[in-house]
Amino acid sequence: MTKPNNQKVGNRGLSAQCDPHGLEYLEEMSMTSMTLKLPRRRLFQAVLAVVISSGALIACGGGSDSAPPAQTAAFYSTWAGSPQNYNEPFAGGAPVAKSFNNQTVRQIMYVSAGGDQVRVRLSNAIGNQPLTINSTRIAESVGGAAINAATDTPVTFDSATSVTLAAGAEVLSDPAPLAVRPNSSLAVSFYVQNPTPVVTVHSLGRQNNYAASGNVVSAQVLPTTETNQFFAWTTGLDVRRTDKPKVIVTFGDSITDGYGSTVDANNRYPNFLSRRLAGDPSIGPVSVVNAGISGNRWKNDVIGPKGEGRFERDVLGQAGITHTLILLGINDIGFSGAFASGQEVSAAEITAAIQSAVDKAKARGVKALVATITPFKGTIFPGYYSDAGEAKRVAVNTFIRNNRSIDGVVDFEAALKNPADPGAIAPQFDLGDHLHPNDAGYAAMANAFNGALLN
């Protein structure tokens, strides 16, 4: 993944009386003169006097007449959609192939941090042929397929409006001069002129996205001909800031991805967490980025690339990352009983995968936070829950709580469990399948996060 391009803003000023070159010259000449003319004791006293006077000269550079230190503008991740294969088969079936042809596709992304510029990351990581996007625009979303037309902004790639990605490639756009508000929605509109297969996507959008005939990327209200809930080709948005926010990348499965949350409401737990932390001045600026994939597992592909294989790209590759919050493992447990032989995963394998991710994060200077796996007793999915699976979950959570190498534990199990039946989700937080939280459950997860972990 392309690293963020840092751009300098502002200039460091020096007081006219504090020329550093003049100071160096004074010290050099003073030392030369004293070395030639003074005995050792007097030389020491004279050197001390020069050091003290030099300190006084340096100190004047910090006075009220000098300019403030320069600030550096850099890009930080504010939205992500971890890539998957649209055509990936699951449970014996595969979706019908999808493509766009002479159509505009408008996708709505709910960002966390704001900034004064934005750039778009496109991906053809899973495609097997070149991908051409003929035109791209970005604007504030005002609901549904509508945009604030006054904010409609072109997105270019090396100054060109059209971009072609080779199979397996990703590309980062030029910075677009759009001011982005925190915890708001942006609309990214693409035009594809020719038949364009949809392969690289983020499948679980929980967001209505739109398509229309022809090139209408700047339409204030898209004349919609179809809707969908996946994110095609777009895997990230970064914003430029002159401060340095904490960037928390949440990593996990459907519970991170927001399965069952209200469509178009942005009630995934990372959304709730972003809004909650934004209201806490003691924490400072924050960006909460979602790298969940519904159905994801540590040890096996389907659905999506396995967690062990995608952690570095989808988490550590995010611009400006400072923290990761890991919640993954329930599907390794549940699918052990639901799938054919060869899918069995032990508690020891799950804890080893967690430890490996923690070690990778810490080696990059990223704080590794790990969440306990949430209850799933009585889930409606055939073969998913078992007493043996529950024993694995308990063992993994014990490992997490007792692991001293983890920078912080977030106890999502405690936040969601039914006190009368600790292996099950509390009824008020249960989506109804006894595995996934509802909107209130996702809010409870965000409220369980201790902001002090970021400080």
Residues of each region from the PLM?
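Beta-propeller domains
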Residues: 255-301, 323-325
